[in-house]
Amino acid sequence: MDFDELLSIAKKKVSERQISREATAGTVAAALLSAEGNVYVGVCIDTPAGMGFCAEHSAIATMITAGESHIIKMVATGVDDDYACAPCGRCREFINVVHDENYKCEVLLEDGSVTTIEKLLPYRL
């Protein structure tokens, strides 16, 4: 699966919605391609006081629930974006620690180039 397909899958899940008086969801979506060839998708949940979580965390939780944790490729995108966005530092570290080989995970960046978690997180654990 190429990055255009992953980005298309993520874009289909991006849709900001109010889920409660204090929380929104769906402003960012992520699609992850596993080593087994499965795609896992998640959306962010934004709440006051930083209690929410990122789309990458959501997709990884679904992936782990399905018995997988090795990520080959990933893409994230926002509600107002026609392009990919890089994972935040917290997500980079989370991706890195859920499987020993995830530092090799390829990531689509805003400019259309591809890098790895290892390059985005040079001082990884």
Explain the meaning of each model-derived region.
Residues 55-75:
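Short, solvent-exposed cationic patches
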Residues 54, 58, 90-93:
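Short amphipathic alpha-helical face segments that pack within enzyme cores
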Residues 1-20, 68-125:
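C-terminal binding/interaction regions
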Residues 27-34:
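Short beta-strand scaffold segments in enzyme catalytic cores
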Residues 43-57:
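Compact, glycine-rich, soluble single-domain proteins
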